[in-house]
Structures are given as C-alpha cells and as structure tokens.
Amino acid sequence: MAEKEHYERTKPHVNIGTIGHIDHGKTTLTAAITKVLADKGLAKAEDYADIDAAPEERERGITINTAHVEYETEKRHYAHIDAPGHADYIKNMITGAAQMDGAILVVAATDGPMPQTREHILLARQVGVDYIVVFLNKTDLVDDDELVDLVEMEVRELLSEYDYPGDDIPVIRGSALKALEGDEEQEKVILHLMDVVDDYIPTPERENDKPFLMPVEDVFTITGRGTVASGRIDRGTVKVGDEVEVVGLHEDVLKTTVTGLEMFRKTLDLGEAGDNVGALLRGVNREQVVRGQVLAQPGSIQTHEKFKGEVYILSKEEGGRHTPFFSNYRPQFYFHTTDITGVIELPDGVEMVMPGDNVTFTVELIQPAAIEKGTKFTVREGGHTVGAGTVTEIDD
C-alpha cells in the first residue's frame, strides 16, 4: 500500500474577510471563491446556504455569528471570514474575534457605496485592517460602462476619505453570482481577484517575530529560587537570560532577567507566542509583580491612562445594559487579565450611548495600563460584560 502523503504547511497563512453593505454580494463572492478554487483542487466548495447559516461563537462575552471558510491559492493558505448580519460584522471587527490582515470590500455596481459600505471602511481603518481590495459586483446588471466607472470613482473617493490609498487600490469588476453558476469568463475574474489579493495584501509578520509580550495571570514563589510570573505569551518569544520589563498598574517600570522557564512543569529553552509558561524572575519580590501587569521586551510597551477606543455596547438581549449611558460613566475596563476603572467622555454631539450601539469615546483610567494602539478590552460592570473595544489612539 502506498504511503499517505504528508501534509506540509509550506504556504504562508493570511486572514482575510469580505466586508460591505448588506445584499451587495459578500456571501455570494465567498461561495464563488471556494467554488472556483475547488475546481483547481485548492479548496472545498462551500454552499451559499452553509456560509449564510453561520454558527454562533462567543468572544469575550459576546455572541457573534461568523462563517469561517478556508482555501488555498498557488501561493498562500487563507482563512476567510464572512458574517451574515451587519451587527455581526461590527462585533467581529471590534472584538477582534476575526483578526483580518486584509479585506475584500464588495460594492454592488447597481447601488454604489451605501451607509454600511462607509461604516465597514471606517471600522476597518479603526481596528487596523490596512489593506483593502475592491470587488465591484453585479456589473453584468449595469448596461452602461460609464456608470460603473462612476461607482468606481465614488468607492475610491470614499476609501481616500478614511486614509486608504484610494487612487492605488486594486478594483476588480465582475459578477460573483455568474461565477458561482459556472460562467467561464466570470470564473477567470475570480481567479484574477485572488491573484490580486495574493499580491496586494502582504503576508503579516508572524506572531513570534513581534516584540515579546506576556500578560501576567498568576504570581507565586518557589522557595529558594524566587518569584515566578505565569501567563500565556501574547506575541514574540522569550528565553532564559532575556532581559524583560514588568509594565502596568504603576508608573515605574521594573527591569529584570528571566532566569528560568517552565511549561507543563517541565523546563523550557524557548517560550513562543501561544505558550502558557512560568517565568522565574531574578531579584524580584512576590509583591512587586501582580496579575494585570505584562512582561515585555524592554522599551516595547509603555503605560498609559488616557486613550480613545472604538467600542461595541451590548444590547439588552445580549445580556448588556438596559439603559443608555452618558459622559462620566465609570465602568471597569478589562485589559489583558485585570479590571481597571475608567471615566468615559463621549465625543462632541453624542449625548448618550444606547445598548446595541457602536461608538468612539475617550477613557481616562484611574491606574496606568500597559496598552497600545490595537489592544483589545472589554467594558464590564460588576463582573458582567457590557461592551468590547479596541484602543484606536493613545492620548497621553
């Protein structure tokens, strides 16, 4: 009997998603991509109905419907997310349930940019999706090419408005439905779209290549050896002998050296992103490190008390608040592994925030936290999650 082929993970991995206004064809395009690539043996064809009936997931206390499909091109392996409802998109992007390295913005040529088109572009910008490729869908339903040119111009202007390179972004025209139905010309368009995605959306930096960061979950003493801080490595790597800083909750940064590493009670040479490790810290007292701080590569992260965040506020049905809140609302902000109280200041012209809204507001924390642009947090009241957000700007 012939030996089974061994699966080699040789292709770089990229996370992408479809964004855009309702009924512009996001899910149809997702289905078409899987079908066309399946014909080349690079994917499993996913049915529109299967993608649309996305399973519920819970991410940081919030229920979100998301469909995950995967496929390959000749060059890469992709995980692609598609969310059925508009609210699911917002929640997905803000909570980071699906971290996207790039997105395909779907705009129907029959409609042009619509309110959710704008909202998804804004959110993509806020949460750090730096690369967008445009698919102008349903072009077969528009008789006049000049009208399609006009829609393309509008989309480019809208992207430029949110600091995307609107003039340079690739725009592909086609019909996702025709491709799904087997039209040869449109199948070629889908293959061309994926070539563009391959080339235009860069391969992200691997988590291991980023500066070391580990939120501290627990601290304990090993008699005769010293203090151990344990947690899950968020990014980067750490090895015995590395200098690290203990950052957060105090203005002062504590410098120390890792003198031992353990995982599953065994000693470890190198801890990588995703590993749960205990790090023995030289010359540190048990009282000097607490849950909620982070261990980090020296100089890579600072503490801040004031920031702007893009936040989704849970609706009453999702277990959130039943009433709106106003400026000076003081909930807890759960960063990394701990709650810190903060005072909210709403932007000019926003009187109050209703359950189910998404909003950008400024927060002043009562203790400094180790945060940076892109740090995720939840908003909690008495231990209950009432919102989730992303730091979009540091203000102090």
From Swiss-Prot:
A GO cellular component entry from the record: cytosol
Residues that hold GTP according to the record: 20-27, 82-86, 137-140
Localization per record: Cytoplasm
Keyword field: Cytoplasm, Elongation factor, GTP-binding, Hydrolase, Magnesium, Metal-binding, Nucleotide-binding, Protein biosynthesis
Annotated family: Belongs to the TRAFAC class translation factor GTPase superfamily. Classic translation factor GTPase family. EF-Tu/EF-1A subfamily.
Subunit structure: Monomer.
Protein's name according to its UniProt entry: Elongation factor Tu
